[in-house]
């Protein structure tokens, strides 16, 4: 145990928290260009074809981003916005594509939970 005098001379150091989304560099979202759009299969015990794209960000990082929702219009050279948030059953995918922003369209015919998929309120 350190004495009071030792703690006055050299206080205890704080643990440095490691970020789960280093490519965002403490920003809420980042813009990037799709370099590859593809599907991949999840870890066991799940089974699907998950839509993913490889993105070159404005700060030079290249990351994988998940494309949520049913159907998308992304292809190579599409400009998209990414946010943090990993996909638990896809190793290495730590970012989500923001639907309805820049070149990424909202989900077609979405009626519920629209704000998460970039869909405007339908005309009554």
From Swiss-Prot:
Belongs to the universal ribosomal protein uS12 family. PANTHER family: 30S RIBOSOMAL PROTEIN S12 FAMILY MEMBER (PTHR11652). It comes from Photorhabdus laumondii subsp. laumondii (strain DSM 15139 / CIP 105565 / TT01) (Photorhabdus luminescens subsp. laumondii). This is Small ribosomal subunit protein uS12. With S4 and S5 plays an important role in translational accuracy. Interacts with and stabilizes bases of the 16S rRNA that are involved in tRNA selection in the A site and with the mRNA backbone. Located at the interface of the 30S and 50S subunits, it traverses the body of the 30S subunit contacting proteins on the other side and probably holding the rRNA structure together. The combined cluster of proteins S8, S12 and S17 appears to hold together the shoulder and platform of the 30S subunit. It comes from the Bacteria. GO terms for molecular function: rRNA binding; structural constituent of ribosome; tRNA binding. Keywords: Ribonucleoprotein, Ribosomal protein, RNA-binding, rRNA-binding, tRNA-binding. Disulfide bonds: none annotated.
């Amino acid at each position: 145990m350190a004495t009071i005098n030792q703690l006055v001379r050299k206080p205890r150091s704080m643990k440095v928290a490691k970020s789960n989304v280093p490519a965002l560099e403490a920003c809420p979202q980042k813009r990037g260009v799709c370099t590859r759009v593809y599907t991949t299969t999840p870890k066991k015990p799940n089974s699907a074809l998950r839509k993913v794209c490889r993105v070159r960000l404005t700060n030079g990082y290249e990351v994988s981003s998940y494309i949520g929702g049913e159907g998308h219009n992304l292809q190579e050279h599409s400009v998209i916005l990414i946010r943090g948030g990993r996909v638990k059953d896809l190793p290495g995918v730590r970012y989500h594509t923001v639907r309805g922003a820049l070149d990424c369209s909202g989900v077609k015919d979405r009626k519920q939970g629209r704000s998460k998929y970039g869909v405007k309120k339908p005309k009554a």
